[in-house]
């Protein structure tokens, strides 16, 4: 079953992205490098 997740910037704490994942196949937390519009650089975003 797919669930909606929010990706939170690790440096400023803003919730910048909404995504979905399959909890059955990927139970671990998502971490990805994304663009943060507040800081205007690419930063690490984690599932929140």
Curated annotation (Swiss-Prot):
Keyword Nucleotide-binding applies: no
PROSITE patterns linked to this entry: RIBOSOMAL_L33
Domain of life: Bacteria
GO-annotated molecular function: structural constituent of ribosome
Family statement drawn from the similarity comment of this UniProt entry: Belongs to the bacterial ribosomal protein bL33 family.
PANTHER family: 50S RIBOSOMAL PROTEIN L33, CHLOROPLASTIC, LARGE RIBOSOMAL SUBUNIT PROTEIN BL33A
The protein, known as: Large ribosomal subunit protein bL33A
Organism field: Lactococcus lactis subsp. lactis (strain IL1403) (Streptococcus lactis)
């Amino acid at each position: 079953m797919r669930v909606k997740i929010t990706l939170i910037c690790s440096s400023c704490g803003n919730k910048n992205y909404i995504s979905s994942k399959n909890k059955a196949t990927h139970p671990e937390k998502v971490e990805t490098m994304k663009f943060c519009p507040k800081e205007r650089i690419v930063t690490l975003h984690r599932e929140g």
